[in-house]
Amino acid sequence: MMQELGLQRFSNDVVRLDLTPPSQTSSTSLSIDEEESTEAKIRRLISEHPVIIFSRSSCCMCHVMKRLLATIGVIPTVIELDDHEVSSLPTALQDEYSGGVSVVGPPPAVFIGRECVGGLESLVALHLSGQLVPKLVQVGALWV
């Protein structure tokens, strides 16, 4: 069943989704617009997911951010960026979603309910002030 969906499970509980186009005989297809700009992809991802983290696998702050959300009970969508992709995060887009929060700089950057919360420091501040859980409940990422 997993193979039919393009999923592979590895020994360390990692699941990989194969995004190669399906064969012509398949009745389902994955629509990927290769013409879509990086900015448009980012906008789409932000609008489709209640909690999304733009992360780097080599960043310890990204790991702490993911662990904090997991501890609360939220499974965020995580987009791992390579070093060359980090520069593709447009600052104008960050300004549009930030609500006045300065998020200029490298990831991690977390978006909750289409609003840029910022980096790890901002996320921890929300948590310590007691505002994070209600915000996650409001966007449907957490049920209490």
UniProtKB/Swiss-Prot annotation:
Family stated for the protein in its record: Belongs to the glutaredoxin family. CC-type subfamily.
Disulfide-bonded cysteines: C59-C62
Species of the source: Arabidopsis thaliana (Mouse-ear cress)
Function: Has a glutathione-disulfide oxidoreductase activity in the presence of NADPH and glutathione reductase. Reduces low molecular weight disulfides and proteins.
GO cellular component, one term: cytoplasm
CDD domains linked to this entry: GRX_GRXh_1_2_like
Keywords: Cytoplasm, Disulfide bond, Electron transport, Redox-active center, Transport
Record-linked InterPro entries: GlrX-like_pln_2, Glutaredoxin, Thioredoxin-like_sf
Pfam families, A to Z: Glutaredoxin
Subcellular location: Cytoplasm
Protein name, as recorded: Glutaredoxin-C6
Domain Glutaredoxin: 39-143
